[in-house]
From Swiss-Prot:
<comment type="subunit">
    <text>(Microbial infection) Interacts with ebolavirus protein VP35; this interaction inhibits the interaction between RIGI and PRKRA. In addition, this interaction disrupts the interaction between VP35 and the viral polymerase L. So the VP35-PRKRA interaction plays a critical role in determining the outcome of ebolavirus infection. The interaction PRKRA-VP35 also prevents PRKRA binding to DICER1 and thus allows the virus to counteract host RNA silencing.</text>
</comment>
<dbReference type="GO" id="GO:0070922">
    <property type="term" value="P:RISC complex assembly"/>
</dbReference>
<feature type="region of interest" description="Sufficient for self-association and interaction with TARBP2">
    <location>
        <begin position="102"/>
        <end position="195"/>
    </location>
</feature>
<dbReference type="GO" id="GO:0005737">
    <property type="term" value="C:cytoplasm"/>
</dbReference>
<keyword id="KW-0694">RNA-binding</keyword>
<dbReference type="GO" id="GO:0050821">
    <property type="term" value="P:protein stabilization"/>
</dbReference>
<comment type="function">
    <text>Activates EIF2AK2/PKR in the absence of double-stranded RNA (dsRNA), leading to phosphorylation of EIF2S1/EFI2-alpha and inhibition of translation and induction of apoptosis. Required for siRNA production by DICER1 and for subsequent siRNA-mediated post-transcriptional gene silencing. Does not seem to be required for processing of pre-miRNA to miRNA by DICER1. Promotes UBC9-p53/TP53 association and sumoylation and phosphorylation of p53/TP53 at 'Lys-386' at 'Ser-392' respectively and enhances its activity in a EIF2AK2/PKR-dependent manner.</text>
</comment>
<dbReference type="GO" id="GO:0070920">
    <property type="term" value="P:regulation of regulatory ncRNA processing"/>
</dbReference>
<dbReference type="GO" id="GO:0042803">
    <property type="term" value="F:protein homodimerization activity"/>
</dbReference>
<keyword id="KW-0677">Repeat</keyword>
<dbReference type="GO" id="GO:0003723">
    <property type="term" value="F:RNA binding"/>
</dbReference>
<dbReference type="GO" id="GO:0034599">
    <property type="term" value="P:cellular response to oxidative stress"/>
</dbReference>
<dbReference type="GO" id="GO:0035197">
    <property type="term" value="F:siRNA binding"/>
</dbReference>
<dbReference type="GO" id="GO:0031054">
    <property type="term" value="P:pre-miRNA processing"/>
</dbReference>
<feature type="domain" description="DRBM 2">
    <location>
        <begin position="126"/>
        <end position="194"/>
    </location>
</feature>
<dbReference type="GO" id="GO:2001244">
    <property type="term" value="P:positive regulation of intrinsic apoptotic signaling pathway"/>
</dbReference>
<feature type="region of interest" description="Disordered">
    <location>
        <begin position="1"/>
        <end position="21"/>
    </location>
</feature>
Length: 313
């Protein structure tokens, strides 16, 4: 599900003397990138950082549904999924498809040697983009912006936006939605920059403490269960994969949620998703002749993935 607000006509998406940038060429040059990564890199090059907002979150139903909106330049698209990450993934994918398919959409890449002082004062950073870059650099989930309040008279509107980054939350207010987002992001950046070196607490440790199980902590964990997984074969018959995954989750500090899919697979088998609250979130698919078998298969696939991640250096 996606929509676009862009209407202006422009030349095709190519990097030429006019200063435009080719999204298609970038995708070809960087295979294997996720839609979120591709769109972010595109936004960085065109000075149009993608901004993600959670529009809807239905977690009280059997299969949770999340809806995220991504805005990059004049393009706005939405995506739905059973996890926040999947919803963001689909929103980014929809935006990329529009950018690739619509030759009338073209962003100009500003000349770094000729900045526009009327749009951005010298040395002033974009706090929304800076916070997103910080999250990507440290492997955190991307910041989420939610419009929580809108009020005031027509000539003096005030917007309140909540920005969430892992377990942290900041609120920003402004005369426009964009200004409210900027203020919330600025508060986060100020909070992180105020962590003094005298306290011997790094920014990564402060936020990382709230992440639970990260790939870095998994690789360096002295835990008995995760190290046993590194040495074990996952093809031994009659192994209780659900129990084994549960023991590792308890040791490493993440939760497991099994989401049964109502629709049968193409070959008539039951399907299930195992969602691990690691950082980033891990979702693995499983199938079988029963719901229980599908869950066991999903747990098996999750264990295989954790084993690969834990063994990497």
């Amino acid at each position: 599900m996606s929509q676009s607000r862009h209407r202006a006509e422009a030349p095709p998406l190519e990097r030429e003397d006019s200063g435009t940038f080719s999204l298609g060429k970038m995708i070809t040059a960087k295979p294997g990138k996720t839609p979120i990564q591709v769109l972010h890199e595109y936004g960085m090059k065109t000075k149009n950082i993608p901004v993600y907002e959670c529009e809807r979150s239905d977690v009280q139903i059997h299969v949770p549904t999340f809806t995220f909106r991504v805005t990059v330049g004049d393009i706005t698209c939405t995506g739905e999924g059973t996890s926040k990450k999947l919803a963001k993934h689909r929103a980014a994918e929809a935006a990329i498809n529009i950018l690739k398919a619509n030759a009338s959409i073209c962003f100009a890449v500003p000349d770094p040697l000729m900045p526009d002082p009327s749009k951005q004062p010298k040395n002033q950073l974009n706090p929304i983009g800076s916070l997103q870059e910080l999250a990507i650099h440290h492997g955190w989930r991307l910041p989420e912006y939610t419009l929580s309040q809108e009020g005031g008279p027509a000539h003096k509107r005030e917007y309140t936006t909540i920005c969430r980054l892992e377990s942290f939350m900041e609120t920003g207010k402004g005369a426009s939605k964009k200004q409210a987002k900027r203020n919330a992001a600025e508060k986060f950046l100020a909070k992180f920059s105020n962590i003094s070196p005298e306290n011997h607490i790094s920014l990564t440790n402060v936020v990382g403490h709230s992440l639970g199980c990260t790939w870095h902590s998994l690789r360096n964990s002295p835990g008995e269960k995760i190290n046993l997984l590194k040495r074990s074969l996952l093809s031994i018959p009659n192994t209780d994969y659900i129990q084994l995954l549960s023991e590792i989750a308890k040791e490493q500090g993440f939760n497991i949620t099994y989401l049964d899919i109502d629709e049968l697979s193409a070959n008539g088998q039951y399907q299930c998703l195992a969602e691990l609250s690691t950082s980033p979130i891990t979702v693995c698919h499983g199938s079988g002749i029963s719901c229980g078998n599908a869950q066991s298969d999903a747990a098996h696939n999750a264990l295989q993935y954790l084993k690969i991640i834990a063994e990497r250096k």
